[in-house]
Amino acid sequence: MSKIVFFCIPAYGHTNPTIEVVRELVKRGNQVHYYSFYEFRSRIQETGAVCIPCDDFMPPAPKDIDKKVGKDLSSLVDMTVDVTLAMEDKVLGELRAWKPDCIVSDSICIWGKLYAKKLNVPFVCSTTTFAFNQQTARLMKQSLSELLRMLSGMPRINARLRQLRRHGYEIRQFYELLQNDNDTETIVYTSKEFQPMSETFSDKFTFTGPSIAVPKPSGHKKSRPLVYISLGTVLNRQEDFYISCMKALKTEAVDVIMSVGGRTDISGLGVIPDNFQVIPRVN
């Protein structure tokens, strides 16, 4: 029997792929402690794992977070450092006392990775979409304004990295926080055939495909096609997009399930066509 710790960010798209993995680990007799958030506690506890909420340590999300996600690197580093240091005393104390055999942390939940390295605990990276390394980074084209924003933020980023080093976290460059290296055991919840530049990743990367439970029958009549529309769990406040989808498909012979996220005001989307089911999320 092993003791395994999971860390994840407060996002369904990052938590959901781990649920059945955790359930299977518990079923096999392992003990699992999962550092997550109140919103996900019931789902995690249903697996038999212990959920440890971290809500009180998260800084308030900026109002313009939708514009910053994936674009403002210095803000991401700020949040990472703030959360890592805010939870440090609590989490490191608990980890030292419990003595886990392994730490599994989401690729965006960087504090889990930092704690594992600081305590010299074997680390596994959980990657919910595509793995990211220096080679795949070249595929991401940046505009001049994005490059200038990144360059202007480098002094701030380097200052925060120095702060981490003063607390015992051996981080030399900021990209070490974000990318997957070929020496780290990594689970990727997509097929290798879908991974860009898959040949650049070592055999430490296990491409499992989706990790989901067998779905219950939905009751949908299969006489017409069923269309599912979703923008994920982070950048989903896109009212114009949802309205365009309804206009495009309202007269088509299809049924549509459109997941718009918990922060989208469904009443603000106007009249919902009869062939549409608009909901915050799909279980």
Show which residues each predicted segment covers:
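Nucleotide-sugar-dependent glycosyltransferase catalytic domains
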Residues: 2-3, 27-226, 231-254, 268
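A donor-sugar binding/catalytic signature common to diverse glycosyltransferases
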Residues: 22, 103-105, 275-283
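Histidine-centered catalytic micro-motifs
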Residues: 15
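Motif I (Walker A/P-loop) of helicase-class P-loop NTPases
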Residues: 18
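Nucleotide-activated donor-binding/catalytic signature segment of Leloir-type glycosyltransferases, i.e.
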Residues: 224, 258-260, 264-281
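Active-site proximal loops enriched in glycine and acidic residues that flank catalytic Cys/His/Asp
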Residues: 8, 36, 231-233, 258-262, ...
